[in-house]
């Protein structure tokens, strides 16, 4: 009887051990599966952020060209208005008034980062250094947008002040096709021939200089985010190579 009972207990213990081993194996397989899934998600998210960074770089390079053109135009106009030798009908003067009009802003692409943060998946990034670098970039990203809003509001303010002296419509209307053209005629610099021009000229120059300053400030913050985007893109590329 005792031998049968002993055998029964040994058999039961053996069964329990086998069940436990089976559970542990299943848990291990599940753990491997989850890790593999998370690794794949991490890679896909990082590739997505890299794609967004490339879009940022392309957009910023376009802004740099526009910034340079406008800064050159402001400089030309300030120098021309400070000179007594330039004629009101100068084509160079008209061209630079054209190119000096308007302002732009950095929009950027942050959809992948926003998806990661809103879904709580930012911790899928296993490298703390890389994760913190990404967070730091997008903090700067948001700060650049805020600063550009400020600079653009200043540019608009000083542009509006100059519009009271300059026939702005004569520069704007020719940009429209025949259907929407207001027929204001060719761009007019007649304001330079008015009797009070010498009194208002310093105000126009000051406003142009302030517009130029805010444009340069906007350009400088764009350079900051551009450099950070290049650095972060390279960091992601190196990390993805190491993951292979």
Task: Give the role of each language-model region.
Residues 1-6, 10, 31-244:
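Long, hydrophobic alpha-helical segments that serve as membrane-spanning/inserting helices
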Residues 13-28:
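Hydrophobic membrane-insertion alpha-helices, especially the h-region
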